[in-house]
Structures are given as structure tokens and as C-alpha cells.
């Protein structure tokens, strides 16, 4: 199983910290999984101009091809101005409409206050649904108060991250079995 984590901003440290924790949990629980972090702060991405993602070069091509090859994607995003960051939106714009077909996508969100939790429901989930993702219904929402010196200090957040990883992997396994059963119906 190939899992790609996306740290969806090119500024700040909280989302990257949360993604590091989450992917470490995934590595410990599922050592056979191929797990990669794409921290968008570490890549020089160009803005989407409507081309097919395979026509781009450099970091843009690397990032989009890694996402397209994944079985599961864990998106980490901060909330900026009550919305997703432009760097993450650009990733969605670079990919085809059906980019997440047969992929499981889960989310964790960092925000300054609890008032921004609806961003996931009203913006991120509709984008992922439009792109045909199998969305893990629950997500991890982490507030400013849950961090101290680039560490997560809320044990409940760690527990929810563990559950998010488990739900993501279980959903991938379930969809693999469903597709195999569906394919077995055809006798050619």
C-alpha cells in the first residue's frame, strides 16, 4: 500500500508537525506500507495552466505523479483566511478531475481557533468529492492550544491521529476487496 501525506502549505510549522506525528504513527502501525511525505514548502511548484499533469517538469511533475500513484492520501492543511492555502488549491488544479478515483483521502487540519472547523465541511470535502475521492468521514482538527514548541501536547489529538491512520488503511483494504469482488463478476 502506498500512502502519501501532503503538508499543504509553504509557510508555518504546525501542519508539518502534525503530519510528522501522523506519518510516524502510520510507519509504526503499518511497517510494510510505502509512506511518503510531500511537504509543499520543500518543492518549487508552478501554478496550474491547464496542461495535463504529466506535461509539467521538475518538482511539479514529481509531486503530481507521486499523488497519482498513491492508494491513500492524508492531507494536512492549515486554515488561512477561513480557507485552504493557495499551495494546496494549486495541487488540486494541477490534477485531473478524476485524480482521486479509487483513492482513499483523509484529512487533518490545523487552525488558530475552533471557529474554522467548517472549512473542511464546506470547502475541502466538496473538492475531494468532486475529484472522486473515497473520503474518510472524520478528520483531525488541531487548534493552536494543542501545540507547544513544535510538539503536540494534547493526548486526545494523538489518539485521533491514530484513529485517522487506522481508518484510512482499513478503508483502502475495504475498497480493494470491493473492487476485486466486482472484477470477479466479469468472466473475461
Residue locations for each model-derived region?
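FMN-binding flavodoxin-like domain, especially the glycine-rich phosphate-binding loop
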Residues: 25, 29-30, 101, 106-188
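Helix-loop-strand module that forms the ligand-binding subsite of alpha/beta enzymes
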Residues: 55-131
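Alpha-helix N-cap/loop-to-helix initiation residues
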Residues: 11-15, 81, 113-116, 150
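Flexible, active-site-adjacent loop/turn segments at secondary-structure boundaries
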Residues: 38-41, 45, 78, 93, ...
Amino acid at each position: 500500500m502506498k500512502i502519501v501525506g501532503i503538508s499543504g502549505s509553504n509557510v508555518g510549522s504546525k501542519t508539518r508537525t502534525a503530519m510528522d506525528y501522523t506519518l510516524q504513527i502510520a510507519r509504526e502501525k503499518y511497517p510494510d506500507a510505502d509512506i511518503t511525505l510531500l511537504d509543499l514548502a520543500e518543492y518549487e511548484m508552478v501554478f496550474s495552466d491547464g496542461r495535463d499533469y504529466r506535461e509539467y517538469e521538475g518538482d511539479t511533475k514529481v509531486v503530481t505523479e507521486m499523488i497519482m500513484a498513491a492508494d491513500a492520501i492524508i492531507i494536512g492543511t492549515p486554515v488561512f483566511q477561513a480557507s485552504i492555502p493557495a499551495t494546496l488549491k494549486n495541487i488540486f488544479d494541477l490534477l485531473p478531475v478524476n485524480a482521486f478515483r479509487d483513492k482513499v483521502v483523509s484529512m487533518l487540519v490545523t487552525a488558530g481557533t475552533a471557529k474554522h472547523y467548517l472549512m473542511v465541511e464546506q470547502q475541502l470535502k466538496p473538492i475531494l468529492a468532486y475529484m472522486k475521492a473515497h473520503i474518510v468521514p472524520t478528520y483531525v482538527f488541531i487548534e493552536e492550544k494543542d501545540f507547544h514548541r513544535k510538539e503536540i501536547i494534547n493526548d486526545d489529538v494523538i489518539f485521533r491521529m491514530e484513529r485517522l491512520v487506522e481508518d484510512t488503511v482499513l478503508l483502502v483494504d475495504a475498497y480493494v476487496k470491493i473492487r476485486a469482488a466486482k472484477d470477479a463478476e466479469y468472466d473475461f
